[in-house]
């Protein structure tokens, strides 16, 4: 890292609500660079809904992290700034989730692997105005593709699938071209939608962070996947 002249961090901030493997990555970085690590743990939820006790547990960690950040940076927490970023994050998330929903059309107006590229913006910059603008532009493009009957999936869409788990990041092109050559389009994934967080206050943020695929119990995880498949017309329930 030093040889590449990348600015070194003063601390690392880790949350395991999406990827548990990040914990060890960040622990190693903190040890290697001899810097503090701030950890926010999102526990597995054995119940279907997120409990108030779970929200309180997560909220306490966030406030502890905030106090540490105030000490490290010399900057104070601002309720007004939080509300501003929350509103922008909501804009980004609403546009992003609606964009992913455009795959409900047959054929889909986009190649599902596009989501794995655009998702990077939601991961790193969801609370920035530029991200909200970008997601709204993406939604507009997908709607226009549907109206024109065009798609970024440059092949005949013979099969529509849900992609389970995280992307094969080192082999995105190999995975994408392998599926496309067989007429297979990934039209939905449990992974991409997980980065669309919508909430109205601090407690709502904590509840949203707890309501992610990694933290859901089996029944909730099952129902979410069934809904995604139904919404994207991967199958329909048999008539009663």
List where the protein language model places each region.
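Trp/Phe/Arg-rich N-terminal binding region typifying the photolyase-homology
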Residues: 1-72, 76-77, 191-234
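A charged, amphipathic alpha-helical module
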Residues: 59, 63-192, 197
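Conserved small/polar residues in nucleotide/adenosyl-binding loops
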Residues: 235-240
